[in-house]
């Protein structure tokens, strides 16, 4: 087996006996793949189809069934003197087992980070994430009440269909 180095990693099924691991490594996203149920892995490579931004952020991957894989994380942007650059929560979709990201959709345009996803029993996609009411999270140590909350989005099962709202 080969070793995958990085932090804040997520793993998802991406087809029969195939797995992908998505890794935050500094400001960038890296991916590695296994074709034998996780016994061996490809060398991790930078995933240019996913956002890179200063400071980076944890993101989530989730199997959508078959070869479909979803990625959810902030797109990011410019920091300000009072706010970080973690905002614009995006959902990316890969019908090719995370080998390329063919569609993306803005889910939440304000402060967002640290999402996690799961498929519900009825096929809907659930996403829980940290959210805030401004463009980026407040960076000062004294923060007002409500500066951050947990939010949940439930997307319909049709989100995995090729043409659904990603066009």
Residue ranges and their predicted role:
Residues 1-167:
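Asp-box/BNR beta-propeller blade signature and adjacent active/binding-site loops
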